[in-house]
């Protein structure tokens, strides 16, 4: 009976070990003058994710959000948050692991990062900022497609060069 159990594949395991703020910054380079003007901001959100293996089956995932609000030509505020998590992930295929690190984990981290950004903006006495949900699955699929297209292009160039 023990031999049968050892031969079966291990069930996938996913555990959140820790969620934490890795880095945080809020700047209002044109204050207090920016508070005297009519508030018609243009808000830009940039986000990035990265992951690193810490130990066997243990990974750190970092979600970086940069929110820039411009009022006319002037920067009203710049908010940067790096929300991180340590995740124990086991029993997944390489493709499933890549999806977990590139989409599932950032999806877990985003509400924490969104709350941090909202809190910083409020402390800067700016109007409430609600960041829309992000479809990390779609972003990850786009990233995979771009990598595949790049690999195919590189293979075609190599084939042309050897011909």
Curated annotation (Swiss-Prot):
Record's subcellular location: Cytoplasm
NCBIfam families: PRK05751.1-4 (NF004393), secB (TIGR00809)
One Gene Ontology biological process: protein tetramerization
GO molecular function: unfolded protein binding
PANTHER family (alphabetical): PROTEIN-EXPORT PROTEIN SECB, PTHR36918
Keywords: Chaperone, Cytoplasm, Protein transport, Translocation, Transport
InterPro entries: SecB, SecB-like_sf
Classification of source organism: Bacteria, Pseudomonadati, Pseudomonadota, Gammaproteobacteria, Alteromonadales
Keyword Chaperone on entry: yes
Stated name of the protein: Protein-export protein SecB
Organism domain of life: Bacteria
Quaternary context: Homotetramer, a dimer of dimers. One homotetramer interacts with 1 SecA dimer.
Coiled-coil ranges (or none): none
Record-stated family: Belongs to the SecB family.
Described function: One of the proteins required for the normal export of preproteins out of the cell cytoplasm. It is a molecular chaperone that binds to a subset of precursor proteins, maintaining them in a translocation-competent state. It also specifically binds to its receptor SecA.
GO cellular component: cytoplasm
């Amino acid at each position: 009976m023990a031999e049968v159990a050892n031969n079966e594949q291990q069930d996938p395991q996913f555990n959140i070990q820790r969620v934490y703020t890795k880095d945080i910054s809020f700047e209002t380079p044109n204050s207090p003058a920016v508070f005297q003007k009519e508030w018609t901001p243009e808000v830009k959100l940039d986000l990035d994710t990265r992951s690193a293996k810490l130990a066997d089956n243990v990974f750190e995932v970092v979600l970086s959000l940069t929110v820039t609000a411009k009022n006319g030509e002037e920067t009203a505020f710049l908010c940067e948050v790096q929300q991180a998590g340590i995740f124990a992930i086991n029993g997944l295929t390489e493709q499933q692991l890549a999806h977990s690190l590139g989409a599932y984990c950032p999806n877990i981290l985003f509400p924490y990062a969104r709350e941090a950004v909202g809190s910083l903006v409020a402390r800067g006495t700016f109007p409430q900022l609600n960041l829309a949900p992000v479809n990390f699955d779609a972003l990850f699929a786009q990233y995979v497609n771009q990598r595949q297209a790049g690999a195919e292009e590189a293979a075609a160039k190599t084939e042309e060069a050897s011909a």
